[in-house]
């Protein structure tokens, strides 16, 4: 008879240790009294979880910058040189390793020079998103006043503890301007005219910006390049960039979700010029939005979207199913990249991810792409972060879209009002993973049956990831089941649990969300783990995200 451990090894998915059962009958029913089981294999390290996986994305879109981050130096709203103080306070709790700016699509229409120099002399420009913004949107959403530029963004990063990640304009600015932007940010004090300009703005010391995106979604109207054409553009932009003795990490514009032809075309074109060309790329950007909830009925961008607040159990599972595709995308693009970049020098950078719903749930009128995140989005975000945690050898960075007042926001703000969304709470709960050693964990649970347009189907029963800091195990668990608890036995092998804490985010209403009027509808609850001489058993509530921090003997 096959040993139980060997059965688990063979049944688990190689990439993440996620066990999917094709039958509603539990294959482990006779092995444990609990309905579900998690086996943490502490000896099987997957790699170090880069804190950059917990990155963020800010763009001059809707109320992200103006009204979200930037309130102005003369505002009555508490601020630090114009930056919303309450936002900074909460961001420090999530340890934002890296923050991306100014886009996104906005980046390929942005001239960095417009956002430096005396604030009163900066030009006003038509925002790239002008045609998307609502007619009742504030003028700052449609016409960029450039009050928040490079200096202010770097100051924001320093206040919150994140590293800046700047995206260069490849569509409408020459490579020379990319070099000049790097010079403005990184040249030593007093060394160049641009260093003097930076000093005049209040920063004599260099910003030391390491991460630079070379364009954004260059396959689309932000370049309309073929992959071979973009490879030539990337080579030109990367041919010479001033480094000032410190390495720069250049991030290339990657595919539109599952477009493997873009990935192959880009890497083959680079390789034709020699291996050193591939080695000039630090990361390959991959974007994935879970937007199509039409269940195969349409691929239309507008008609396929679901509602952020009005959804049923089927819509719940369909969003998670769409989100889980990112793991397949990581695997397929990674495999293809390895055919050309055989040493896997280039890593994946998932610098845009999250759900994208149709308009209508915004709490601030005029914020066209603002969404109200619910418990569904919290579970989605936990699931996605767990996928990144389980792939630390492949994913070097990830950036949730977006930080505030747009799409999968961690925070919502308007004027003097501010609230942490369920997504923001998830990011704080996952902090213990940052910098930890990811270890393989096998999650076992009966699949969840549900009816999908008259046809029976299933969804997995538990999901999560595990990491270790010294003797401390961080284990995050998502229970996607909208109805049932999951009583789960947790095994850590020979290293027995001594003590621990458990933090759970859940709500009986899967539509629950936090608002300016009711800020604490969805909040995490923390308590001490009850650990005895018998097996550790934890009951995970329906539709929940849980973090366990366990001290091991």
Spans of model-derived segments:
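Non-catalytic accessory regions flanking glycosidase/transglycosidase catalytic cores in CAZymes
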Residues: 3, 7-21, 27-283, 326-359, ...
